[in-house]
Curated annotation (Swiss-Prot):
It comes from Caldivirga maquilingensis (strain ATCC 700844 / DSM 13496 / JCM 10307 / IC-167). Residues 8-204 form the AMMECR1 domain. InterPro entries: AMMECR1 (IPR023473), AMMECR1_dom_sf (IPR036071), AMMECR1_domain (IPR002733), AMMECR1_N (IPR027485), AmmeMemoSam_A (IPR027623), Uncharacterised_MJ0810 (IPR023472). This is Protein Cmaq_0360. It comes from the Archaea. Gene3D superfamilies: Hypothetical protein ph0010, domain 1 (3.30.700.20), Hypothetical protein ph0010, domain 2 (3.30.1490.150).
Length: 219
């Protein structure tokens, strides 16, 4: 399993993501890596996605923004700052985050392992290769590409085929594109740190444990 960071480092990243967004809302300034940044986070270059969710009155959550960078072209700290700002202000599905929302949103940071192209000789081999609760997916075909984080199929209780189909649709392709010649499929893992509530304690998600609620083996 891909777990490069301990919980304290994960807490740092989540709080950094929130701080970056709050500072930009208030001053339009992009923060720099803080002086107390753990050195490991400045040395590693990993892809990072930030997810922002709104908490409803009934305690459920609703997506408010999710953007990131799957390939580690900068260090993890800079990638976290950049992805947090993009999720808050540049997600085309939503209006920019407002200062009045800061007390009702949760931040989640996903640190991605390097992408690995899946090697398979048949659709069945690919289905056996991709593990829900472990892998995220990137689908590429021609000029089209789509990415789904590992937590997405767990949250929706998708099986592997549905996960692959949805990744194709995310790339604006036919659901079955993953089984067609010429489509490139990449897998990766993610270490996911999340606030329990707005400004709350940070914990590391265990997708395998969360997946048990889906009872996919019983279907």
């Amino acid at each position: 399993m891909f777990k490069p960071y301990n919980l304290e480092q994960g807490k740092f990243l989540v709080r950094l993501a929130r701080r970056a967004v709050e500072e930009f809302i208030r001053s339009k300034r992009i923060i720099k890596p803080p002086e107390d940044t753990p050195s490991r986070l400045l040395e590693d270059n990993y892809g990072v996605f930030t997810t922002i969710e709104t908490i409803r009155e009934d305690g459920s959550t609703e997506l408010r923004g999710c953007i990131g960078f799957p390939r580690g072209n900068v260090n993890t700290v800079k990638a976290t700052i950049n992805s947090a700002l993009a999720a808050a202000f540049d997600d085309p599905r939503f209006a920019p985050l407002d200062v009045n929302e800061l007390e009702s949103v949760i931040f989640e940071v996903s640190v991605l392992s390097p992408l690995e192209e899946a090697k398979f000789n048949s659709p069945k081999e690919l289905v056996n290769l991709v593990k829900v609760g472990v892998h995220g997916l990137v689908i590429e075909r021609g000029m089209y590409s789509g990415l789904l984080l590992p937590q997405v199929p767990v949250e929706y209780c998708w099986d592997t085929v549905m996960f692959l189909d949805e990744a194709c649709e995310k790339a604006y392709l036919r659901p079955e594109c993953w089984a067609e010649k010429g489509t490139r499929v990449y897998t990766y893992e993610a270490q996911i740190f999340r606030e329990k509530g707005p400004r709350g304690d940070v914990y590391e998600r265990d997708l395998i444990e969360e997946l048990k609620k889906c009872h996919l083996d019983e279907a």
